Amino acid sequence: MSLMLEPNPTQIKEERIYAEMGLTDEEFAMVEKILGRLPNYTETGLFSVMWSEHCSYKNSKPVLRKFPTTGERVLQGPGEGAGIVDIGDNQAVVFKMESHNHPSAIEPYQGAATGVGGIIRDVFSMGARPVALLNSLRFGELQSPRVKYLFEEVVAGIAGYGNCIGIPTVGGEVQFDPCYEGNPLVNAMCVGLINHEDIKKGQAHGAGNTVMYVGASTGRDGIHGATFASEELSESSEAKRPAVQVGDPFMEKLLIEACLELIQSDALVGIQDMGAAGLTSSSAEMASKAGMGIEMYLDDVPQRETGMTPYEMMLSESQERMLIVVKKGREQEIVDLFEKYGLAAVTMGKVTEDKMLRLFHKGEKVAEVPADALAEEAPIYHKPSKEAAYFAEFQAMKMETPKVENYKETLFALLQQPTIASKEWVYDQYDYQVRTSTVVTPGSDAAVVRVRGTEKGLAMTTDCNSRYIYLDPEMGGKIAVAEAARNIVCSGGEPLAITDCLNFGNPEKPEIFWQIEKSVDGMSEACRTLQTPVIGGNVSMYNERSGEAVYPTPTVGMVGLVHDLKHVTTQEFKQAGDLVYVIGETKAEFGGSELQKMIHGKIFGQSPSIDLDVELKRQKQVLEAIQAGLVQSAHDVAEGGLAVAISESAIGAKGLGATVKLDGEATAALFAESQSRFVITVKRENKEAFEKAVEAIQVGEVTSTNEVTIHNEENEVLLTANVDEMRKAWKGAIPCLLK
């Protein structure tokens, strides 16, 4: 579309063209007031994309302010490309998680691939080398052909991008529930390492300094991607394929190396990824954060399509692009550096003092807008919140234990539920050993990556049981953070901080906004108690299809520090004769459990409860015992309860089983999902020291029989299961469903 055809300011107002771009009548009036005139077409586009929920968090900011974001190790909290946490020895870990849900629903391969590419850029734009990727995925039930297609393509897209770029995908989670059928969730997390002096910010300081565009050229892909991410999916969403970007991992690999070399140069002033809202957000945010303005000449933007308008160039979300500010007079060095990698680096503007974002094209001024108005002055909405109607009903239910006839058959059925079953089909497609720093590969409680040149490691995980959060958002929010920390501790790490990805339905519905508020309350409380501040994250709203919202899914990405790699602990049994301990009491808690869903086909009632002080005490005891060398294996008890946790520890070992005695009512003892529990094995000679250090109950021992046998307190056998048969069922479940 050429400039001739763009509607003029009067038409934009009278024909309400701004509404098609996502601005409300009130918002358009605010823009008019800020500018003191009617905006032109390009300016309307700038505001519509920067004031979208995706870029401005206008509906979620009041809630996000509840998160604790500071701590003695936090070097950078929310507000930059990614958060940064000190890990000692002048080193720091940089990490962030983001969603790419809407694009993945309509173009799953590219949607997932570019989600990975975008989160990697957020990390290296801080000056860090990306060392690991994780992902948290949600799909409908695998019986559906459409879900199979989405699942296969999303995994292929993640693998395709991560493997080509040479960053290991080391962990994550995949869960399946009917509510995600029309709206899958694809959350990608990247972890990087940095030395303190290399930390860079996305800020445009120094009037007269040069603004440069580096990386891939700009096309028409992804225009209004941020706006598309801020509305519900519908039948017409298929037509929005152009709003899905296309990724090139080989280009990004070169971009990483070039940018990491650039960061060592004193010519660099600021650097930011062109992510959501492309050139608009990177320029407006860099100027606003520095209290400056930016002037840009759009004729100089490298374009891969002809006749692009200023509107299209500013709103394109083409991938693999960065905006940088360099010291005046040093431009040629930058051009030479990028040329070495076969990449473009083009001067396209300068930093100004007047705090305006000013755009020129073909000799004319095409936009003049205050940078702060775009980046900081979006309206903030305090949405009405109303307790969901189902909540009181679920809370009032008397908890019933599901009826189980045959414990062994039930255990086998649980091991084959896709949410519990082995995800080997997924992670076998990922290169998780590239860079050769992966110490604990996918499949244990958390992945561990070596910090090169030290004896330290980084433990990392993503967690969120959205069924619990649906039943009780506040309790479920606490559990999500606690389970992530439990996974880090079981791997020998000290939990440091979290990044979050808040996936919810339409915030304009009061019951959805209530879910958001309550789950953030629960997460915030858990973060404070467990001392894991939130250092950044992402909000993804409008995850609905035909009015049906997904379960509230605030995914937690957590990183922990393994002080010495000899503390690294995994979930599988190590040797026959070791003693098996259970930490934590089991109650008949089945609300939102795998057993409840399997037997009743739906979830209802109260979610499991959690006491965060008890959780903290147990985590500290377990971590200290691991660091003291008293623990052989550690596994958190999660979906499927104790029977599944013990079976998983046996399945991961070779030729080992266990004989265990569990007290209490059999179904609860085996399958309840009470929180703050661990299965730990200990060498016989460490029995006394371990029991002194940790409040735990010895329930049995590891055997060389290749069988798991569980007795009740009367010593009657509840079940005996062959480990090879369990492994076959557990590993075969997902491939079998995909056939």
Curated annotation (Swiss-Prot):
Gene Ontology cellular component annotations, sorted alphabetically: cytoplasm
Residues that bind substrate: S99, H100, N101, H102, R121, Q245, E317, S318, Q319, S540
Entry binding sites for ATP: Y57, K96, D500, G537
Pathway in which this enzyme or protein is active: Purine metabolism; IMP biosynthesis via de novo pathway; 5-amino-1-(5-phospho-D-ribosyl)imidazole from N(2)-formyl-N(1)-(5-phospho-D-ribosyl)glycinamide: step 1/2
Domain of life, per lineage: Bacteria
EC number from the UniProt entry: 6.3.5.3
Keyword Magnesium: yes
Annotated Mg(2+) 2 binding sites: D122, D273
The reaction(s) this protein catalyses: N(2)-formyl-N(1)-(5-phospho-beta-D-ribosyl)glycinamide + L-glutamine + ATP + H2O = 2-formamido-N(1)-(5-O-phospho-beta-D-ribosyl)acetamidine + L-glutamate + ADP + phosphate + H(+)
Primary enzyme class: ligase
Gene Ontology BP terms: 'de novo' IMP biosynthetic process
Binding sites annotated in the UniProt record for Mg(2+) 1: E98, N538
Localization, UniProt: Cytoplasm
Catalytic residue list: H54, H100 (proton acceptor)
Sorted UniProt keywords: ATP-binding, Cytoplasm, Ligase, Magnesium, Metal-binding, Nucleotide-binding, Purine biosynthesis
Gene Ontology molecular-function annotations: ATP binding; magnesium ion binding; phosphoribosylformylglycinamidine synthase activity
Stated role: Part of the phosphoribosylformylglycinamidine synthase complex involved in the purines biosynthetic pathway. Catalyzes the ATP-dependent conversion of formylglycinamide ribonucleotide (FGAR) and glutamine to yield formylglycinamidine ribonucleotide (FGAM) and glutamate. The FGAM synthase complex is composed of three subunits. PurQ produces an ammonia molecule by converting glutamine to glutamate. PurL transfers the ammonia molecule to FGAR to form FGAM in an ATP-dependent manner.
Family: Belongs to the FGAMS family.
Listed name of the protein: Phosphoribosylformylglycinamidine synthase subunit PurL
Organism of provenance: Bacillus cereus (strain B4264)
Gene name tied to this protein: purL
